[in-house]
Amino acid sequence: MKLTRAQHASLYGPTVGDKVRLADTDLLLEIEKDYTVYGDECKFGGGKVLRDGMGQSAVYTRDEGVLDLIITNATIIDYTGIVKADIGIKDGHIVGIGKGGNPDIMDGVESHMIVGASTEAIAGEGLIVTAGGIDAHIHFISPQQIDVAIASGITTMLGGGTGPATGTKATTCTPGKWNIERMLEAADAFPVNLGFLGKGNASTPAPLREQIEAGAIGLKLHEDWGTTPAAIRTCLSVADRMDVQVAIHTDTLNEAGFVEDTIKAIGDRVIHTYHTEGAGGGHAPDIMKVAGLPNVLPSSTNPTRPFTVNTIDEHLDMLMVCHHLDPNVPEDVAFADSRIRPETIAAEDILQDLGVISMISSDSQAMGRVGEVIIRTWQTADKMKKQRGALAEDQGKGNDNVRIKRYVSKYTINPAITHGIDDYVGSVEVGKLADLVLWDPRFFGVKPELILKGGLIAYSQMGDPNASIPTPQPVFSRPMFGSFGRARGTTSITFLSKAAMDLGVHEALGLQKKIAHVKNCRSISKRSMKYNDATPNIEIDPETYEVKVDGEMITCKPFEEVALAQRYFLF
């Protein structure tokens, strides 16, 4: 029996050479490799393959390699490749990406990918699977952010705060041992991976060390607490000794020094620069030049992604609120005006597309939207495809695979590497926590179908619970069983520093979630960033704000209409 490509795709999803459009964007993926076996595909349903003695083994037990969950015939988008495969999950982790089923009657089934009586199935045919997103710039202002974030496909949130305190509304810091311990206790209640940054603004080491020993996974330097060269040097020295990351929001007003002074204080040590363009804060007008340095891991926040006709006006109002400024004080208004520059925001689009800026995050409720990291990432990718055409690496191939890998890396693997958690999350790879997001291609980047947390469904598009089937309206993202009870603790991780784990902080606090410590935070560089490791020379004119990359001026026009927008949000 032979199937046409169209018939095969409708039954089992696309295969090598098939192309899929991502929602209403101009981005096309092409399957690079198919790990399934033609004619022996797994498929669940009445009269289908995954039945006893057929695609499901009648004899193998869980201890003999039977999976807890198989996602069949999934299209995977990951920095590692764009492939078609079955995904095998056991004990909450990915154990196989390849061919699952019954090895007694099917070709190519791997010994760790056996489907048996212990196996649940998710039909991945025609769906796209990505790693759960990582938002590495969270102001923990309200716990309700977590519901919005996970519903959008974010499964790991890193940042700081203690709730709607004035300091947290402006800065991403959980300051001091007592506050860190309380936030670690609160983390048990949520079905996402969490990690907290301490306050890095101190010019002596002891106040910084005690926060890392209390459980902080890193330190945040913020201008509202005084990001002076002395504080920068001290913070990085402590981080180097204790193997944690430092995130920085530099001195917009250039009070304690200019961007050159900050670069000198950083030296050759690795650092994560938040909202590197500068609208979210940082040396005006030229903080973005740090994005070209080999030891700087730069990120954007999502309100400037992508550059549109509304970006500038929105930012001025946001800034006044977030940084506790008074519109009646001329100096406060001047502070706000100095940060919002159309020229550098336009250049930020290009730098994202060139792989110079390596990450995208939210800046949640503090000049950023927690549920829009993923959607704005893909809006930026689409805007750049429309304005700049295919990347050089994609020229002549008829697909956008390199661009797609570049952009998915910005909110998955790269923040994981930056903050020392890439052994656990950040990609669709064997051994990692099964934090996976399943998308209907028509809604890719906008509304996930399923969000798996540690191998269990935590959120899903779900219809009326009183209906006779799951699909009747109203259909929207709702919490599932992985979001409740003790399941949250076995399917999610609270990240600590190694110092805190060695001191037994998790045991002293009685934390219920899985615990893991960050590592290799200080041995990385820009070269560690997947598909986003470019280090060109960046210059910003101090009067016109024009941006040059390796001597060539870069800019783009703002869009009046973007993809993934109003047609998806009619209700």
Swiss-Prot record:
Pfam families, per the entry: Amidohydro_1, Urease_alpha
PTM text: Carboxylation allows a single lysine to coordinate two nickel ions.
UniProt xrefs under InterPro entries: Amidohydro-rel, Metal-dep_hydrolase_composite, Metal_Hydrolase, Urease_alpha_N_dom, Urease_alpha_subunit, Urease_AS, Urease_asu, Urease_asu_c
EC category: hydrolase
GO-annotated molecular function: nickel cation binding; urease activity
UniProt cofactor(s): Ni cation
Enzyme Commission code(s) on record: 3.5.1.5
Any one annotated GO CC term: cytoplasm
Catalytic activity: urea + 2 H2O + H(+) = hydrogencarbonate + 2 NH4(+)
Family, similarity comment: Belongs to the metallo-dependent hydrolases superfamily. Urease alpha subunit family.
PANTHER family: UREASE
Subunit relationships: Heterotrimer of UreA (gamma), UreB (beta) and UreC (alpha) subunits. Three heterotrimers associate to form the active enzyme.
Protein name (database record): Urease subunit alpha
Gene it is expressed from: ureC
